[in-house]
Amino acid sequence: AKDLDRDDLDQWDVDVFKPIPSDGSHPTYDRDEVHEIYREWRKLFNQYNPPRFAVAEAWVNPDRQHLYASPKELGQVFNFEFAKKNWIRDEMHEAIAEGIASAKQSGSTSTWVMSNHDVPRNASRYALPQVSVPGHQHQLALDWLLRDGKTYVEDRALGTKRARAAILLELALPGSAYI
């Protein structure tokens, strides 16, 4: 990890690496001990000109995202709140407000993640009925996927239009866009 100046590391993905502190505990979910490790990484990142940064793939509560995005740690965190939301105005507004607040708290730029390998793709999600199920993100989309697309009517044309509109919204927001 000391040679971060290599061209082939542009897409280095450390979400599969789970650092284990010396006490033997396993920080699989938002453990405070992991921040000591990330502060050590920051020392290494700062040895380069310009300093390197990393983006945390941390599915944590929005009120803890700032810890990962801090300039003393990784520098950015994926804001998954945006990817969790349905095509419902109030849900999208909430995600945007949380993302901007988290960025201000950390002193980092805000990030916007529309989709990734952990959630159904936005065009598929938005093609299905948009029903908010408290405590469960994309419940209808997950059910639809698990049952081979047979539980709900999919409107692909509508899903594509909504996905395009959502991406344009994402690109208009301040910060970094991860589509």
What residues fall within each predicted segment?
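Active-site and adjacent substrate-binding regions of carbohydrate-active enzymes
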Residues: 1-179
